[in-house]
């Protein structure tokens, strides 16, 4: 439920409406939760990811192809890697907003004057409300990604599983 609650923090921080052009960078579990929440607002949504198999899960929520040169009013970085912020900087419109859902180890090397000159707002976004997340689940408005459950004694099988190799988190 936590990734869904984190996704629900975004609409409390950024105004979303049908006329907004929004991009989500990332194709993992958190990005999937964010895409489901953001799509409830009727935005023009594009999901940008590197894994064709993962992007198939997003097709009913928005476009899964970024067109070179296209820019967005709101860009949400859910990659977990510094390259996500670099891409966000390249595709956000002037006077647009970048929402950072990623936490990076170490520092990013950014030219901050670019954000000032182009009047780009950067919003840090972390945890969110659990009760509304549970409400969305109970009403069937969002679906949680499939997870694999493992007994602790089967930890070797868990680490050898497809979910671990594909970068999805799972409880042991």
Predicted regions and their residues:
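Short active-site oxyanion
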Residues: 43-45, 119-122, 144
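Structural detector of well-ordered beta-strand residues that form the stable sheet scaffold
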Residues: 46, 97-100, 123, 167
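A general structural signal for well-ordered alpha-helical segments in protein cores
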Residues: 4-7, 31, 72, 85, ...
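Mid-domain Rossmann-like dinucleotide-binding core that forms the NAD(H)/NADP(H) cofactor-binding site
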Residues: 1-69
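N-terminal Rossmann-fold cofactor-binding loop
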Residues: 47-51, 78, 126-127
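C-terminal hydrophobic helical "lid"/dimerization subdomain
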Residues: 86, 131-172
């Amino acid at each position: 439920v936590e990734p869904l609650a984190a996704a629900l923090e975004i609409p409390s921080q950024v105004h979303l409406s049908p006329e907004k052009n929004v991009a989500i960078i990332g194709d993992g579990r958190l990005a999937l939760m964010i895409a489901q929440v953001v799509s409830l607002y009727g935005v023009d949504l594009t999901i940008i990811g590197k894994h064709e198999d993962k992007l198939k899960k997003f097709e009913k929520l928005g476009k899964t192809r970024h067109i070179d040169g296209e820019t967005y009013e709101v860009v949400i970085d859910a990659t977990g890697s510094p390259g996500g912020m670099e891409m966000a900087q390249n595709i956000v419109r002037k006077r647009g907003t970048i929402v950072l859902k990623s936490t990076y180890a170490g520092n990013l090397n950014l030219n901050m004057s670019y954000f000032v000159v182009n009047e780009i707002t950067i919003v840090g976004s972390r945890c969110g409300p659990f009760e509304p997340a549970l409400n969305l689940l109970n009403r069937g408005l969002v679906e949680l990604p499939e997870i694999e459950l493992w007994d602790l004694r089967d930890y070797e099988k868990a680490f050898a599983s497809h979910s671990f190799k594909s970068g999805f988190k799972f409880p042991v």
